[in-house]
Amino acid sequence: MEKKESLDSSLKEIVSVCKRRGFVYPGSEIYGGLSNTFDYGPYGVELLQNLKQLWWKYFVHLREDIVGLDSSILLNPKVWEASGHVSNFNDPLIDCKNCKTRIRADKFLEDQKGEGFATGLTLEKMNQVIKESNFACPNCGQRGTFTEARDFNLMFKTSHGASAEDSLDIYLRPETAQGIFLNFKNVVSTTRRKIPFGIAQIGKSFRNEIMARQFVFRTREFEQMEMEFFCEPGTQKEWFSHWVNYCMNWLTEQVGIKKENLRVREHEKEELSFYSEGTSDIEFKYNFGWGELWGIASRTDYDLNQHQKFSGEDLKYQDQVQNKKYVPFVVEPALGVNRLFLAVVTDAYEEEKLPDGETRTVLRFSPKIAPVKAAVFPLMKKDGLPEKSREIFADLSKLGNIEYDDGGAIGKRYRRQDEIGTPFCITVDYDTLKDNTVTVRERDSMSQERIAVNQLKNWLFERL
């Protein structure tokens, strides 16, 4: 119990700094909110954009074998029948008959029995364990009040059409992948890409989660960075290994996440998705424990075969070199943007005890992803210091998001930027007016040095 309370407490600290410093706000807050919805504030948006741009750079722009796509959120409902989501995209649901609380049965059992306990359990076995154990409802505390577990489809249903008579029941997409599969033939035709190659996209997905929780880790509306890599059957294992390593290296070398906070976990056969022959998760050590950050799945030729069957379209690839046609196999690295956001904030967050006995909160983001690259401070709001500061600020703004801050004592301004994760703070003082140098303070070490204004832009550029 003590450990769980400690984990809950540390997550609350993350939530607090995100709200206090404008990273994440509760959704619809002035109307009392809407559970499990969040709005990303000024610094949260900057962090998200930096993460997405960094992903796009390394998964599209720096690779000749990958192109981009932006497919529709709303798709013909037959797509989801073909993909198997209508019949298979379910989680086990139980209700408390006393307080009407709805609970995801497998996660509830793992909370009670330990991580991994529910892996591979059938609904019948879950019902047996719940009945024999006589668990208490986590909401009202009553025992023996749970309904039998049943499948609950996670897709959001809506209507497409102007009137009830001609409206069509459709779904908000639960993953971005299907839009890529539908456009496989278009991309091959228009870009003349040869296998092996990938199609990547960033976009919103929606899942009606039974137990949406743990801040932005599990939400009903979320953003994905997915890539479907098409390869010749028989080569998928080699590519699978390549993408697991490539993704892990990107997280550590580019995003800057500590290696000790990451691990690779291979799925047991019983927990594989209905479309996968093998999946490995890159997990991050969140405040609440290890959780999936990035899933790399070998989807075989399942999706293209299904869409071929249901649509009647020939989705085989014509291999000109080998003079044969085949349905490509697919390896999919699928990353949740919101989970990555929470991972980098958690990884960067530190309450540091200073030599003078004070404590400072600091977010040690890599400069590549920091929402603010540098902040410019005039020491005083007079004697030409603001004018000189504005001049420096305007010049540095070409490097990225630079902030101008003239409010309060310098020490308080440093602390504010530490909580935002700003790598460098630049103070314009009276010596600046004499020798055209500024004080640059580095976030992590808090060390300071004087830099000539005419060298400042290049000095920063080399470190961002």
Swiss-Prot record:
Cellular component, GO annotation: cytoplasm
One Gene Ontology term of the molecular function aspect: glycine-tRNA ligase activity
Record: residues binding substrate: 104, 175, 222-226, 332-336
One Pfam family of this chain: HGTP_anticodon
Main location: cytoplasm
EC number: 6.1.1.14
Key words, A-Z: Aminoacyl-tRNA synthetase, ATP-binding, Cytoplasm, Ligase, Nucleotide-binding, Protein biosynthesis
Compartments where located: Cytoplasm
Amino acids binding ATP: 207-209, 217-222, 292-293, 336-339
GO biological process, one term: glycyl-tRNA aminoacylation
Keyword hit for Glycosyltransferase: no
HAMAP family linked to this entry: Gly_tRNA_synth_B
Biological role stated in the UniProt entry: Catalyzes the attachment of glycine to tRNA(Gly).
Subunit structure of this chain's protein: Homodimer.
Listed name of the protein: Glycine--tRNA ligase
Organism of provenance: Leptospira interrogans serogroup Icterohaemorrhagiae serovar copenhageni (strain Fiocruz L1-130)
